[in-house]
Amino acid sequence: MLRKGCCVELLLLLLAGELPLGGGCPRDCVCYPAPMTVSCQAHNFAAIPEGIPEDSERIFLQNNRITFLQQGHFSPAMVTLWIYSNNITFIAPNTFEGFVHLEELDLGDNRQLRTLAPETFQGLVKLHALYLYKCGLSALPAGIFGGLHSLQYLYLQDNHIEYLQDDIFVDLVNLSHLFLHGNKLWSLGQGIFRGLVNLDRLLLHENQLQWVHHKAFHDLHRLTTLFLFNNSLTELQGDCLAPLVALEFLRLNGNAWDCGCRARSLWEWLRRFRGSSSAVPCATPELRQGQDLKLLRVEDFRNCTGPVSPHQIKSHTLTTSDRAARKEHHPSHGASRDKGHPHGHPPGSRSGYKKAGKNCTSHRNRNQISKVSSGKELTELQDYAPDYQHKFSFDIMPTARPKRKGKCARRTPIRAPSGVQQASSGTALGAPLLAWILGLAVTLR
């Protein structure tokens, strides 16, 4: 049984742990515990606000005017950081050094960022979602995704990327979604997607693709969705798509397809394909212009002899002169860098490799993160609804990470739970309550 007077000490202890006595949350921000969350979104901050608690796990700083990030701005306890739609132009290479708990990092819609150091994301062993869309990136340095074995969602859409070197994604053995649409890619080499053995969705539409190596998709045995529409492709060999044994949704429309003899292998592959595909409208020859390649007959290829197009079959090595010649037709939006260093390791021999079919990412608050962002990628796919949409519903497609539309106006629905702490601009709000409790304690004595 408690002493009669001990209730005073007990009340004071509870008060000290629960009331905001003049600090603990940055000015103009909202904070709440379990997990410790700081929301400073849309407050016109030009720099990271001071006073972010050291134990903060979730930090929301989107829709401000922050210009740079450096070491010391955040604590390694951080699990989630949303800092999209700011004015970030520079991220110090060691900004996230030691952040072994970080799982979700949204840097999207910082249109003046343009370049990243190779070591920017080094050591983020638990990172499972990385957003780099609309960042003005023209190139990605070799090794930038090295060691990110837990990464599942990578958003690189709507940048100015012209070229991706072989093995740029080789360490991403658990990646399931790769969004590269809305860039300026004009070719896909043999080793670009090497090692992506768990990739489920690959979006490459609205680039400038003219050429795809016939082994570009060699490792993508689990891919279910491939979008290649609105590019500059004229041909694509059936051998290129043959490894995609799990493919369900394919979009090839919006290209100037040559439906002559060079299209025979693609036509044969499409005849065998049992998934849903868009139309493949012919641009040439003139007599087939406007026809759907899928609907051509055997008789249309009866006079075709010899091997399929050597343009796609040969092992094509992109030389510096090749790239320079291509860039004359597609001016760069920034200096592209080719720093590829093929690793040469089979998927099973790389450190951190996990067997296909397992979701190996383990983190503390997956349900919360997924709930906050549910509905994003469904919107993405509906935005580019294929002309075969009547054959299936996007609502029954596998659950996946969403994409935000437009200006990235996602706002965190902060509802003040018990223990909410609102930063104050003057006198501590707990003082009157403290006086009342002390008076009650004296009365009880």
From Swiss-Prot:
Keyword list, A-Z: Cell membrane, Cell projection, Glycoprotein, GPI-anchor, Heparin-binding, Leucine-rich repeat, Lipoprotein, Membrane, Receptor, Repeat, Signal, Transmembrane, Transmembrane helix
Keyword Cell membrane: yes
Membrane disposition: Lipid-anchor; GPI-anchor
Region (Disordered), start-end ranges: 307-377, 401-424
Disruption phenotype: No visible phenotype. Mice are born at the expected Mendelian rate, are viable and fertile. Compared to wild-type littermates, cultured hippocampus neurons from mutant mice display an increased number of excitatory synapses. Likewise, mice with a triple gene disruption that lack Rtn4r, Rtn4rl1 and Rtn4rl2 have no visible phenotype, are healthy and viable.
Lipid-linked residues (GPI-anchor amidated serine): 424
Domain of life per record: Eukaryota
Gene Ontology BP, a term: negative regulation of neuron projection development
Complex and partners: Identified in a complex that contains RTN4R, RTN4RL1 and NGFR; the interaction depends on the presence of chondroitin sulfate proteoglycans. Does not interact with MAG, OMG and RTN4.
Name the record gives this protein: Reticulon-4 receptor-like 1
Naturally occurring in which organism (per UniProt): Mus musculus (Mouse)
